[in-house]
Each structure stands twice: as C-alpha cells, then as structure tokens.
Design a protein with these regions (language model features):
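Intrinsically disordered, low-complexity regulatory segments of kinases
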Residues: 1-396
C-alpha cells in the first residue's frame, strides 16, 4: 500500500570513482549476437521513472531485458524494474499473464511463490516503446546460488525447501490458474527476501564503489552487482512468464530451453503442464549434481535433436511405440518398430550411474523422486502436488 509520507529524496549517484571499459570490449547484454543499441533502453543509475522509481543499480540482464534495483520514492521501499527491448513479444505476453494471474481468487499457498506485477509503463525508444514492469524486489537466482556453492552443488538443506516451495507454486499454477510456465530453469527461480537490509547494502555499495561501466556517447552499459545471500534463505519465487501459456488444454510448437527440452517437444507431440514437471527434474538435477543432464549444444536447435534423443534413450531406455505414434517428428528418428535410426551413438549409461552426489538410501530416494519427473510419457510424470509430498523432499 502506498505510504502517506512525503516522497523519499532522490539519491545522487557518484560522478567518479568507477572503472570505465574500453569501447571495444563487449559487456553483459552486448555479448548476445542479436544485441541492438537502437532496440535497447540504456537505463542510467540515478534515473527516475514515472516520477517515483529511482534506479540504484543493475541486478542482471537477459536475452530481451535488463533488471534494476530501484527505490520506490512514493512507497518508500525497494522494487525491481524490468526493461524490455523494444517490440519483443515476450514483454506483452508476460504482462498479460501477470494480469491474468491477478484475477484468480484463491487462498492457495502457491500464490506466494509466483512473482506478482506491481506496476507497468512504457518508455520511448528509437525502434518503438520499451515495456517496463515493476515487481517486488527479490534476491539471487538459484543459478547464482549454485555458482557460489562448493562444487557448484546446492546443499540439500537448501535444495529441498527451495524445490518444495517451487512445487507448491506450480500446483497453484497448474490446478488453479491452468498456466504452463514453459521456461522453468535455475535463472527463473529467485530467493524471496524478508529483510530489506540486503537491498540497503546493495545500494550503499553502489555509492561507495560504483559499478564498472562502458560509456559510448549517451549509451552506458553497467556491470551487474550481486546481492548477498540471506541467512534465512528457504522460500523461492517463480519469475519470468514471457513464454507462459494459458487458455487451452494442450499446446504445440517449440518452447523450453534447449538443454531442458522434454520428449514431447523434440518429437512434436502436443504438450501441457507436464513439460514444467520435466523441467523441474532437469533443474533439480543441475542444482544437486552440479552438471547438466543433457549437454549437446550445436549451432541450431534442430541439429542437436538426435543427440538429445540419444541421451534420453541412454538414461530412460527406448520410448514406448505408443508415444512415438503421437509425434509429428517421430519418423525422422525412429522406424515403425520404435528403433532409433539416427547415426548418433546411444551411450552405455544410466541415471543411476551418472548420479554422483549421494549413495545408499539417499541415492535411492533421490532417484525415485527424480524419476517421478523424468519420464518419456507425460501422463506418467507425477503432478506437482504428488511430488511435494515425496519422501525425499520431506526428509531433512
């Protein structure tokens, strides 16, 4: 709720004391091959939007947006500003999904695990307007936490409550909102923050040691600044709904990150919320093992499909013929008897062999939990509600 107090004063950012990179160096969002200065809004630290949101520092960047910690001068609190490149479909879709989610009246606890939209507006740009979204400020992504962890593996003390929190959110998303996220991955799940001391520290550090940057005329590219990890980290929030879908029982087309693609995506089978369950399995494996389950990355998505399928066969066994009959692209990779026809070799391995972070009963319990998600047939994957009651996730 908006405060009745007078607006907070604006902070003046430092005008010196920062390192400036040579313009030949590509920094952060510039490293994407599709980056276009004309399609990007270059936020400047200290800039105020809508006469109320002052940018304090850069939190991160993605393929179509940048994220900034801001101070809401009217509400006297920290928020996150997400600024999209001009004219990208994800911006419109993300706002549409958030507004739809707001219309759902429910007491489901999973609502707390879904990022909410506080405000939205547009900024003018050279190639059209830039959509901007204002959210509650959140902490690090699970990917950032993994990178900071020993051996890039997240401890079960954190991973289990994080995963359970995500599954509760997905139960709401799938059963009450009937939304398929389609892009669940470690970069789209973030820590909920109860104490804004972390944001105060971020703000003060930016004042004391201003971020490295690149200055090219009126265009400034900043290096992102990391947030601290709270002592009471246990709750996470699912974010980034730019590719989410709702309004149908089944969908078609290419979705999901390359390395997380479910069988129905590569085989051309109509998909539903069970692709999110597959993705949770991929993400939990990444965080627990410190490595990807699927590794093949070739220049194009289609080029990597045979290797992706070969890896699936190695880890899950051959797909049921009944499933292949549902696939638009199945005959490209399999004969009518379900034999894999690609030249790509199927490794002699298994999930049991590749799981290296536990042993004994712990390993058995983890793999049982994982296999509730990593299944060829979508209907054989467990629901989010079934998974959140799994023994592995509830035994500390």
């Amino acid at each position: 709720m908006e405060s009745q107090r007078a607006p907070s004063p604006q902070r003046l950012p430092p005008t010196d004391g920062f390192e400036v990179l040579d313009n030949a160096y590509l920094l952060e969002e510039e490293t994407y091959s599709w980056y276009s200065p004309e399609e990007t809004y270059h936020v400047q630290i200290g800039e105020v939007f809508q006469s109320r949101y002052q940018a304090l520092g850069k939190l991160g960047f993605g393929s179509v947006s940048t994220a900034w910690l801001c101070r809401d001068l009217m509400g006297h609190e920290y928020v996150t500003l997400k600024v999209f490149v001009s004219g990208h479909r994800q911006a419109e879709n993300e706002e549409k999904v958030y507004r739809y989610l707001k219309t759902i009246k429910t007491s489901h606890p999973g609502v707390a695990g879904i990022r909410s939209l506080r405000d939205s507006f547009q900024l003018p740009g050279k190639r059209g307007p830039h959509e901007c979204l204002i959210h509650d400020a959140l902490g690090l992504t699970l990917g950032e936490i993994r990178e900071m962890s020993d051996g890039e593996k997240v401890s079960t003390d954190l991973l289990k409550p994080f995963t359970k929190c995500l599954l509760v959110a997905l139960d709401f998303l799938h059963t009450k909102a009937h939304v398929v996220h389609t892009d669940i991955q470690e970069g789209n799940v973030m820590l909920a923050i109860k104490d804004d001391a972390i944001f105060k520290t971020f703000e003060q550090e930016e004042m004391d040691e201003p971020s490295l940057r690149k200055i090219d005329g009126d265009r400034i590219i900043y290096a992102s600044r990391a947030l601290d990890v709270p002592d009471d980290a246990s709750h996470v929030v699912l974010c980034d709904f730019g590719d989410a879908q709702f309004g149908s029982k089944a969908y078609g087309g290419e979705v999901m990150p390359d390395l997380y693609r479910a069988p129905e995506i590569v085989l051309g089978i109509p998909w539903n919320e069970k692709i999110d369950i597959w993705a949770v399995g991929m993400m939990v494996w990444d965080l627990y093992e410190g490595k990807h389950m699927f590794k093949e990355r070739l220049p194009s998505r289609m080029e990597s499909v045979p290797a992706h399928i070969a890896r699936m066969i190695a880890l899950m066994g051959p797909p049921p013929v009944k499933l292949l009959k549902r696939g638009q692209f199945s005959d490209t990779f399999f004969d009518e008897d379900g034999n894999f026809t690609s030249d790509v070799k199927v490794e002699d391995t298994s999930l049991e062999e590749e799981e290296e972070n536990s042993e004994g009963e712990q390993k058995t319990a983890f793999l049982k939990f994982l296999k509730g998600m990593v299944q060829w047939v979508p209907e054989e994957r467990k629901t989010a509600r079934e998974l959140m009651n799994d023994p592995w996730i509830n035994i500390r």
